[in-house]
Regions:
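Redox-cofactor binding/interface segments in oxidoreductases and associated redox assembly factors
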Residues: 61, 85, 124, 337
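Extracellular structured ligand-interaction cores
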Residues: 3, 205-209, 330-332
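Class I S-adenosyl-L-methionine
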Residues: 70-77, 87-309
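Conserved S-adenosyl-L-methionine
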Residues: 1-55
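C-terminal target-recognition/interaction regions appended to catalytic cores
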Residues: 256-407
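Conserved acidic residues
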Residues: 33-35, 41, 61-67, 81, 120, 193-197
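S-adenosyl-L-methionine
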Residues: 46-75
């Protein structure tokens, strides 16, 4: 099977096609060839290369620089079975309109490569919000440039001003536009929402998976069904990782794994990377120390209203789930690129007074401990939070491999 990975990030989706799960460990698949992968972010590229080396040729940089001649050179006249990965959902929101945002052009580049290589199938995932997203038409001046308006945001006594494009109207659902676009180039498209917990990932992460199959090949495709094992909790995933103090980093295991998931994550690793905690200011530290499992911003402010905590610590910004502490015996909430930030959406450790470490986030995503990331703390958190969970990717890879086995 010959595969191309576009918008690959640090390689979460590639992981599922590169490895399979056998007898409690990740084993490299046979008869799988990655023709090339493409990613723009330099740190994500470094992470990808660190994990796959020369086994997956990486074309670093803007997807627009991958010319048709370059594609011909890479595919060597052979057919492509699957293209995995896809553009961000925002790139579809102004489909069919005159574009000024570079990111909004990405879906066109994706279509260009699909039409060029004509894979038997394609797969990419996106946020659940894609299903409700509508096409946006922006107000424009006589020269066709988008008109911007200034808006004010109030946070307590502070007022922030910023400009945003002025919306003229909303069109039809973006997902319907996507289906039409792919159908026009010869693909039947199916769309389904799946939760990571269905596939042994200890995280309530719902994502939309878009599958395309060529209309001329009569491919029988079925979305993977989740395993029937018990849903894993956040403590099931990370309780064997050593405690980390504020401003500290830990690289040695000091506890034994207590379940199959932890054993799978640790197999092949003799040390821990990216297991560190930043330093907090007095206000953040006060919040963390007073928020219990399942609580968040509103619960903390309620303590202030009761006179139990000084009003100078009152939280005025953020959603209800910000500054939220995880519940030990429940799956983690969705891991995002703010996973190591206490003010993020429910990412405070269920027991320790700190946010999750990047390695804990990677564990919860189902990346094994030997998987490498690259760059600053922000870079690493972005690579972890934006990835498709490897166990989820394996399930989809298995279904696609099965569907194409007779083609």
């Amino acid at each position: 099977m010959r595969i191309i990975d576009l918008f690959s990030g640090a390689g979460g989706l590639s992981f599922g096609f590169y490895y399979e799960l056998q007898d409690g460990e990740f084993v490299r698949r046979s008869n799988i060839e990655f023709v090339f992968a493409n990613e723009f972010d330099a740190h994500a590229v470094n992470a990808f290369k660190s994990n796959y080396g020369d086994n997956i040729p990486m074309i670093e940089g803007d997807i627009r620089n991958i010319t048709d001649d370059k594609i011909d050179e890479l595919i060597k006249g052979k057919s492509i079975d699957v293209v995995i990965g896809g553009p961000p959902c925002q790139s579809f929101s102004t489909v069919g309109q005159r574009q000024y945002d570079d990111k909004a052009q990405l879906y066109k580049e994706y279509l260009r490569i699909l039409e060029k290589v004509k894979p038997k199938m394609f797969l990419f995932e996106n946020v659940k919000g894609l299903l409700s997203m509508k096409e946006i038409f922006y107000e424009r001046d006589e020269e066709g440039n988008i008109v911007y308006e200034e808006i004010e945001k109030h946070r307590g006594e502070h007022v922030f001003k910023r400009k945003k494009p002025k919306i003229e109207r909303y069109g039809e659902l973006v997902i319907e536009k996507i289906k039409k676009i792919f159908n026009d180039i010869g693909y039947d498209v199916s769309v389904e929402t799946k939760c990571a917990t269905e596939f042994g990932v200890p995280q309530n992460r719902e994502r939309v998976f878009i599958i395309g199959k060529r209309t001329d090949l009569n491919i029988e495709w079925h979305y993977p069904q989740g395993n029937n094992t018990a849903v894993l909790s956040v403590s099931d995933a990370i309780s064997d990782l050593p405690p980390v103090g504020e401003g500290k980093e830990v690289s040695k295991y000091n506890l034994e794994p207590t379940n199959d998931y932890q054993r799978l994550m640790r197999k092949g690793s003799d040390c821990i990377t990216e297991h560190y905690c930043g330093e907090y200011g007095e206000k953040i530290r006060t919040v963390i120390e007073n928020v219990k499992q399942g609580q968040g911003k509103d619960d903390f402010n309620a303590l202030i209203d009761k006179g139990l905590i000084d009003r100078k610590y009152y939280l005025t910004s953020g959603y209800k789930n910000t500054y939220g502490r995880l519940v030990a015996n429940q799956p983690c909430t969705t891991i995002t690129n703010n996973l190591a930030t206490p003010s993020g959406l429910r990412c405070i450790h269920y027991e320790q007074n700190r946010a999750l470490t990047p390695r804990e986030g990677a564990r919860i995503q189902s990346f094994p401990d030997w998987y490498k990331f690259d760059g600053s703390r922000t870079d690493v958190a972005r690579q972890v939070g934006n990835a498709v969970p490897p166990l989820m990717a394996i399930a989809f890879a298995n279904s696609i491999i099965e569907a194409l086995a007779v083609k």
